From Swiss-Prot:
Localization per record: Nucleus
Renumbered ranges of Sequence repeats: 72-157, 173-249
Region feature (Disordered): 325-357
Residue numbers of Cysteine sulfenic acid (-SOH) PTMs: C363
Xref: CDD domains: CYCLIN_BRF2
Originating organism: Bos taurus
InterPro entries xref list: BRF2-like_C, Cyclin-like_sf, TFIIB, Znf_TFIIB
Assigned protein family: Belongs to the TFIIB family.
One GO term of the biological process aspect: regulation of transcription by RNA polymerase III
Name by which UniProt lists this protein: Transcription factor IIIB 50 kDa subunit
Length: 421
């Protein structure tokens, strides 16, 4: 057979293919010499008798790893090494990426979503192992848009059916506060702005817990709340030197980015602290404002559980309390004037005690303004004819029914038509 070479022993050209198990062999039919066996060769002259074997036939793989998947796997491994994650994290993130890349919704997605897929798999792995890592950190490393990243993250969790716990706020506070450059003196940080790390972290945790108890954290990004709490904790430890420092300058000194909603979270925290300060007798005479209340944050946090209960009332229990108050009004009418007078000794005449504020999320206390659609213009003038089927809705008494029947009979008689049976 031409084109297959000759037998090296007898020189015959009668070479045939013989399958030995799953291995193809080229055998001389005259002398039985095995010319080629498998894909391994020992000399350069043997290469002329070999044929090219495809990757899928030699390894049993039906599909090759695409270039985009190879780039994604490299990106996953690079992220894990940059973040200094344990090797087990890297293996889990790679496995999640390979599973997600096989999904039809991901393979046909646009390039922007595929680029953030590696970061989503790393974030899922860290969340499952309670490793403090935020979405913003991954987006900064990948130069990715936060909205695209969050949408892809939720899609991957849903498609893969993963159980991802929520981020531990305490661990996030410790990790985030450790990145502040305020714990050692430097040319960019004056000595009066340097603070002890443990004191600042302890007070920041208390302020974040207070924000969590008063609905300032629910449904929001945690970093703006933590930034505002860290700023207040830093100011309250040495208020005489730091009250003049603004939030923007504080973030610049600490070498951290200022989140956009941090100013709003700061004002909400100060409003909560003012409400709590109104419940302390020695602070009521000082007429505190949002700037001077920072000096007394230590006292407020020391009694925060009692002050929160006194300063706020639960919105869900408000209706129950109102019903009990209405029921007690009838019983209280028999009380004498002495009891009524004793309850209002400290209040001026004609004034009622102020009720505590509602303990509700800010989105319910100040709902966003929505455009109300204009009511449809009614073209009804009142002169329209009423059909016989609709007029029955306007009849109320039997007398009206009889009068209507008489009027209808008279109308038919006037028109010369016989009455219906």
């Amino acid at each position: 057979m031409p084109g297959r070479g000759r037998c090296p022993d007898c020189g015959s050209a009668e070479l045939v293919e013989d399958s030995h198990y799953s291995q193809n062999q080229l055998v001389c039919s005259d002398c039985g010499c095995v010319v080629t066996e498998g894909v391994l060769t020992t000399t350069f002259s043997d290469e002329g008798n070999l044929r090219e074997v495809t990757y899928s036939r030699s390894t049993g793989e039906n599909e090759q790893v695409s270039r985009s998947q190879q780039r994604g796997l490299r990106r996953v491994r690079d992220l894990c090494r940059v973040l200094q994650l344990p090797p087990t994290f890297e293996d889990t993130a790679v496995a999640y990426y390979q599973q997600a890349h096989q999904l039809a919704g991901i393979r046909t997605a646009r390039l922007q979503k595929k680029e953030v897929l590696a970061g989503c798999c790393v974030l899922i792995t860290c969340r499952q192992r309670n490793w403090p890592l935020t979405m913003g950190t991954i987006c900064t490393l990948l130069y990715a848009d936060l909205d695209v990243f969050s949408g892809t993250y939720m899609q991957i969790v849903k498609l893969l059916g993963l159980d991802v716990p929520s981020l531990c706020l305490v661990d996030l506070v410790k990790t985030y506060c450790s990145s502040f450059k305020l714990f050692e003196a430097s040319p960019s940080v004056p000595a009066k702005y340097v603070e002890d790390k443990e004191k600042m972290l302890s007070r920041t945790l208390q302020l974040v817990e207070l924000a969590d108890e008063t609905w300032l954290v629910t449904g929001r990004h945690p970093l703006p709340v933590i930034t505002a709490a860290t700023f207040l904790a830093w100011q309250s430890l040495r208020p005489s030197d730091r009250l003049t420092c603004s939030l923007a300058r504080f973030c610049k000194l600490a070498n951290v980015d200022l989140p956009y909603p941090a100013s709003s979270r700061l004002q909400e925290l100060l409003a909560v602290l003012l409400r709590m300060a109104e419940q302390l007798a020695w602070l009521q005479v000082l007429k505190l404002d949002k700037r001077s209340v920072v000096k007394h944050i230590g006292d407020l946090l020391q009694h925060r559980h009692m002050l929160v209960r006194k300063a706020f009332r639960d919105g869900t229990a408000e209706m129950d309390a109102g019903e009990k108050e209405l029921q007690g009004q009838g019983q209280g009418q028999g009380l004498g004037d002495e009891d009524v007078g004793s309850s209002s000794l400290e209040l001026p005449a004609g004034k009622r005690p102020s009720s505590p504020a509602l303990l509700l999320p800010p989105c319910m206390l100040k709902p966003p303004k929505r455009v109300c659609p204009a009511p449809p213009v009614s073209m009804v003038t009142g002169d329209e004819d009423i059909s016989d089927s609709e007029i029955e809705q306007y009849l109320r008494t039997p007398q009206e029914v009889r009068d209507f029947q008489k009027a209808q009979a008279a109308r038919q008689a006037a028109q010369g038509t016989p009455n219906p049976p």
